[in-house]
């Protein structure tokens, strides 16, 4: 049976996901059968598994790095936020309901058996299971019934490596402080630490590594320099998705993307960001739509009606509607497609409080939210004339006159999506479209951006190989492997 090693962090966004991905590729290159595992993830960025389940996108990237198919057991509990205090709960790939934060804390203990079952199943397939924790290991206020960090590590008897991020500052305090606040039995699970995202001369932090080791008693397992190739990998969470974007002076086409509170599957933007000829501008609902916009792209949402209300509250809906009236192009993906219709209805409160609302009125369609979720990989040919591969992940059924002009013909499934009579307004439920080089090239041709210059999926593979080489150069893989049990 496989050995396992868990990577926890001093906080969120310290690089746990990419470290696990890079190590998965590095150990797979050594001939080991590797499986990634994250007991609990919180993300609206999800991937579809072959059996019609869903897991966090970070675990999908890690599975790709390990060169193995996706499995719902790689992320047995996925929380998909629907509000500031509540989330949809997905267990072993299937939606089991929604829960407020306080109720979920009581629910967690009942989920541990499913988590351990998934972990055991992966161990039967692998030589090595690389486990990723969630958030911070030091959130001791949430320790009761924990399944994401030390609660899992102790239940499954998996040794832990703690990761700190020096790029954000305070890494010595964060690592030493974690040891200070942890229960002694939890702290004893930690076998060593890694300092991640270092910039500058490593010799200058040698004494820092010694200080941390001296205060904690943990082994110093490595100082990992900042990996610039990470920008070529899919976004792992929403932190920074609405952050400032550097202008692209050579870009011929500018795409405006409203970033709404419950944005989902935002990695649809990554392939577009990678193209030198496209400038993808994230804008807030309170912003004015830039006058030089060539395309408005409305992306996915975990709470479509609530996000449409946020768009209206900021006033940006007026600009989008005026842009469309002037002949501007608008494309909606999944939740964005639903917003573009004449009305949305959620009679059973699937995404939030029961109710209905007017849509943006850009397409002659309407959507009714239903409890049944469609999770499937798809292939087909779009109205842009190019074939594609992608996936659907949505609730809701959309019907109306404009569906007579579908956005795509899906192989084995028929017509999908809707297009306005003038062809300038389009909506589809398909995610992952623009990760397909053929479809991205077709969009760029339509917008006058020139030919596509990026082989996106090949670039992801190159970045994973580069990450594996980077970690191999700065970490002792044999020592890490010796810690696993």
Swiss-Prot record:
Residues of the GATase cobBQ-type domain: 252-439
Species this chain originates from: Azorhizobium caulinodans (strain ATCC 43989 / DSM 5975 / JCM 20966 / LMG 6465 / NBRC 14845 / NCIMB 13405 / ORS 571)
UniProt similarity note: Belongs to the CobB/CobQ family. CobQ subfamily.
Protein name: Cobyric acid synthase
Molecular function per GO: ABC-type vitamin B12 transporter activity; catalytic activity
One biological process term in Gene Ontology: cobalamin biosynthetic process
Physiological role: Catalyzes amidations at positions B, D, E, and G on adenosylcobyrinic A,C-diamide. NH(2) groups are provided by glutamine, and one molecule of ATP is hydrogenolyzed for each amidation.
Phylogenetic placement of the source organism: Bacteria, Pseudomonadati, Pseudomonadota, Alphaproteobacteria, Hyphomicrobiales
Coiled-coil intervals: none
Active site (catalytic residues): 334, 431
Pathway linked to the protein: Cofactor biosynthesis; adenosylcobalamin biosynthesis
Entry-linked InterPro entries: Class_I_gatase-like, CobQ/CobB/MinD/ParA_Nub-bd_dom, CobQ_GATase1, CobQ_synth, GATase_3, P-loop_NTPase
Keywords for the protein's UniProt record, in alphabetical order: Cobalamin biosynthesis, Glutamine amidotransferase
């Amino acid at each position: 049976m496989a050995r396992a090693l868990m990577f926890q962090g001093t906080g969120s966004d310290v690089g746990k996901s990419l470290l696990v991905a890079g190590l998965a590729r590095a150990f797979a290159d050594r001939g080991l059968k590797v499986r990634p595992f994250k007991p609990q993830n919180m993300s609206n960025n999800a991937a579809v598994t072959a059996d019609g389940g869903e897991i966090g996108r970070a675990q999908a990237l890690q599975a790709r790095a390990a060169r193995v198919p996706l499995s719902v057991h790689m992320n047995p509990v996925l929380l998909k936020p629907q509000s500031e205090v509540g989330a949809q709960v997905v267990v072993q790939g299937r939606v089991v309901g929604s829960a407020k934060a306080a109720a979920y804390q009581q629910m967690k203990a009942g989920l541990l058996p499913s988590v351990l079952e998934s972990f055991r199943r992966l161990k039967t397939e692998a030589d090595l299971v690389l486990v990723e924790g969630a958030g911070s290991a030091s959130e001791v206020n949430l320790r009761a019934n924990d399944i994401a960090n030390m609660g899992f590590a102790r239940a499954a008897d998996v040794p832990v490596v703690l990761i700190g991020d020096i790029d954000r500052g305070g890494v010595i305090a964060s690592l030493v402080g974690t040891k200070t606040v942890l229960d002694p039995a939890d702290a004893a699970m930690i076998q060593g630490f890694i300092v991640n995202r270092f910039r500058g001369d490593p010799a200058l932090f040698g004494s820092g590594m010694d200080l941390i080791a001296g205060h904690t008693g943990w082994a110093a397992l490595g100082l990992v320099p900042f990996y610039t190739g990470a920008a070529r990998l899919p976004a792992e969470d929403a932190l920074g998705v609405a952050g400032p974007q550097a202008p692209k002076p050579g870009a011929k086409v500018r795409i405006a993307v409203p970033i709404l509170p419950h944005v989902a599957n935002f990695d649809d933007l990554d392939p577009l960001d990678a193209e030198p000829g496209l400038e993808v501008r994230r804008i807030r609902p309170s912003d004015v739509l830039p006058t030089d916009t060539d395309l408005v792209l409305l992306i996915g949402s975990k709470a479509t009606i609530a996000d449409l209300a946020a768009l209206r509250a900021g006033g940006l809906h007026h600009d989008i509607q005026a842009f469309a009236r002037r002949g501007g192009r608008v494309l909606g993906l999944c939740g964005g497609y639903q917003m573009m219709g004449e009305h949305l209805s959620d009679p059973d409160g699937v995404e939030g409080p029961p109710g209905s609302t007017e849509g943006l009125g850009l397409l002659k369609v309407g959507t009714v939210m239903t409890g049944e979720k469609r999770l499937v990989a798809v292939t087909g040919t779009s109205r842009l004339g190019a074939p594609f591969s992608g996936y659907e992940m949505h609730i809701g059924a959309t019907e109306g006159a404009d569906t007579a002009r579908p956005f795509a013909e899906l192989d084995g499934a028929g017509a999908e999506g809707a297009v306005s009579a003038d062809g300038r307004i389009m909506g589809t439920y398909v995610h992952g479209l623009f990760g397909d080089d053929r479809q991205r090239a077709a969009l760029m041709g339509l917008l006058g951006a020139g030919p596509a210059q990026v082989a996106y999926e090949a670039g992801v593979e190159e970045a994973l190989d580069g990450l594996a080489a980077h970690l191999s150069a700065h970490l002792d893989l044999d020592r890490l492997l010796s810690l696993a049990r």
